């Protein structure tokens, strides 16, 4: 089996359906005997340029190890699902399990926001 990195962008109005989509896609990977090494839901983010007159999309990143047939099925599913705006599937040489730069940057900002919030509360007193 080969390793793949999959990123897909979902229409922002369909954000509530993303957990179901993720469950469906990971289910098809596991059903074929594959493995999900990394799964990150980046949430709604600003697009670099408008796609179908939209300025935001819901991003999902998956690193999986599956046979080629499953990748073909996923790509077909992405192509015919109107909620998926864009998708990208890349073959990788090995399993990637560490946090992506997007996830790492988000986790770095989180403690800073908590510190700023605490400073604001102290200033009010």
From Swiss-Prot:
Keywords of this entry: Ribonucleoprotein, Ribosomal protein, RNA-binding, rRNA-binding
Domain of life: Bacteria
Entries under Pfam families matching the protein: Ribosomal_S6
GO biological process: translation
One MF annotation (Gene Ontology) recorded for this entry: small ribosomal subunit rRNA binding
Biased composition (Acidic residues): 116-125
InterPro entries: Ribosomal_bS6, Ribosomal_bS6_CS, Ribosomal_bS6_sf, Ribosomal_S6_plastid/chlpt, Transl_elong_EF1B/ribsomal_bS6
Residue ranges with Basic and acidic residues bias: 104-113
A single Gene Ontology CC term: cytosolic small ribosomal subunit
Region called Disordered, residue ranges: 97-125
Family to which the UniProt record says this protein belongs: Belongs to the bacterial ribosomal protein bS6 family.
Function: Binds together with bS18 to 16S ribosomal RNA.
Protein name in the entry: Small ribosomal subunit protein bS6
Organism: Haemophilus influenzae (strain PittEE)
């Amino acid at each position: 089996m080969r390793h793949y990195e999959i990123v897909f962008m979902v229409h922002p109005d369909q954000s509530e359906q993303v957990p179901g989509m993720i469950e469906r896609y990971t289910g098809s990977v596991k059903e074929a005997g594959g493995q999900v090494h990394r799964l990150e839901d980046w949430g709604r983010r600003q697009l670099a340029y408008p796609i179908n007159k939209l300025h935001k999309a819901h991003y999902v990143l998956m690193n999986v190890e599956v046979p080629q047939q499953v990748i073909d099925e996923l790509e077909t599913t992405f192509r015919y699902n109107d909620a998926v705006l864009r998708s990208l599937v890349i073959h990788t040489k090995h399993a990637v399990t560490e946090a992506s730069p997007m996830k790492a940057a988000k986790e770095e900002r989180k403690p800073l926001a908590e510190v700023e919030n605490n400073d604001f509360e102290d200033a009010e007193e």
